[in-house]
Amino acid sequence: MLEQLVESWQINHRVTVKLLDALADDALHATLSTRGGRDVARQLAHVHEVRLMLAELTSKTNRNAKLPHFAKGESPTRKQLQTAFGASAQGVETSIREGWANDGQLPGFKRGVMPLVGYLIAHESHHRGSILLTLKQTGHKLNDELRWGLWDWNKL
């Protein structure tokens, strides 16, 4: 069961990276906000920061690891996001494994390791949907392989 839970997390991570990798550079700056809201890059940075917040909250190993953070309001580059996502995905995996070894209990997240993974996957799915809608409404075309491939977890 542990390996299935870790694999579920890693598939979710690969979906987010697949979306990032498919975006044109100008798409990272797309936004629907007229009042300074997050562009696509900032939405992705937010996803990374939430991963880190929970990874550091639930694991002393992660708190001591000096994981890479973005400044509030920063709109990172693709390369910065790719590097950051690799680190935060590993941090979450560390929390999963440590929680599993502790009968599913995690410091700082009272519901335990399985609800933590569910929360993170739901959070990232929400933001991926928001990003796809932003891209569609700002005229950025996404190919069918990306639009439908994000849902084919058997191939990711």
Residue ranges with predicted function:
Residues 20, 51, 89-96, 128:
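A structural signal for well-ordered alpha-helices, especially hydrophobic packing surfaces
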